[in-house]
Amino acid sequence: MAPALLLVPAALASFVLAFGTGVEFVRFTSLRPLLGGIPESGGPDARHGWLAALQDRSILASLAWDLCLLLLFVVQHSLMATEAVKAWTSRYFGVLQRSLYVACTALALQLVMRYWEATPRGPVLWEARAEPWATWVPLLCFVLHVVSWLLIFSILLVFDYAELMGLKQVYYHVLGLGEPLSLKSPRALRLFSHLRHPVCVELLTVLWVVPTLGTDRLLLALLFTLYLGLAHGLDQQDLRYLRSQLQRKLQLLSRPQDGEAE
């Protein structure tokens, strides 16, 4: 019972940290660019052009710092997902391997958000300034962000979020049920090996669909787009499995309604 008393709080702490980081990530990627307004040192008249920005050391230093933060997150997220590192962490942390990975990812993302340096004086790729675009573009972006985040949360529920967060591994271990992934079908394991980030399109929508796309936001969107693109490798078998699982879940959801109709 003693190990369980240590394992469960550790897994729950990792989950709480990841949940809080997710809430902060929503603020960082959506609320701040959509509702935060123009920074005090920014504005159309204070911004440099692209050529002038390349000669401004403060802008280049901020972008270089942001790039280092993003690379830190990418290296951590990718390195800890390799088989060698997973084997090492499993040897020393056992069933908490996934929880450790989630906690380290959350901490790396917290570093990115906390120490991110905006470039309000930098050039913009696009900006909705003139009416009616200044009114309708932010509203459209807000709607798309809300829909995207709702889809992201829905997909995480479908994709066994308890296993993704490391909670299910500890729960199964305490009950003596073994490893959760060992109970999944080969088709499901194949899909999970190809798609551990099941929110690619929705996250890209959040990153790119903003009223003003400045240089620091462009850097954030570009690097995450490249990373998400390289991290996915779905093929026709995976798509057929996803389609069959979706149809199965829809049938399960429709059964109570059919019973009530009778």
UniProtKB/Swiss-Prot annotation:
Superkingdom per UniProt: Eukaryota
Organism: Rattus norvegicus (Rat)
Membrane topology per record: Multi-pass membrane protein
Sequence ranges on the Perinuclear space membrane side: 29-58, 115-133, 211-216
Disulfide bonds: none
Record keyword Nucleus present: yes
PANTHER family for the chain: NURIM (PTHR31040:SF1)
Protein's cellular compartments: Nucleus inner membrane
Protein name per the record: Nurim
Chief place of localization: nucleus
Residues annotated as transmembrane: 5-28, 59-80, 98-114, 134-164, 192-210, 217-234
UniProt keywords, alphabetically: Membrane, Nucleus, Transmembrane, Transmembrane helix
Residues in compartment: Nuclear: 1-4, 81-97, 165-191, 235-262
Family recorded in the similarity comment: Belongs to the nurim family.
Entry's Gene Ontology cellular component terms: nuclear envelope; nuclear inner membrane; nuclear membrane
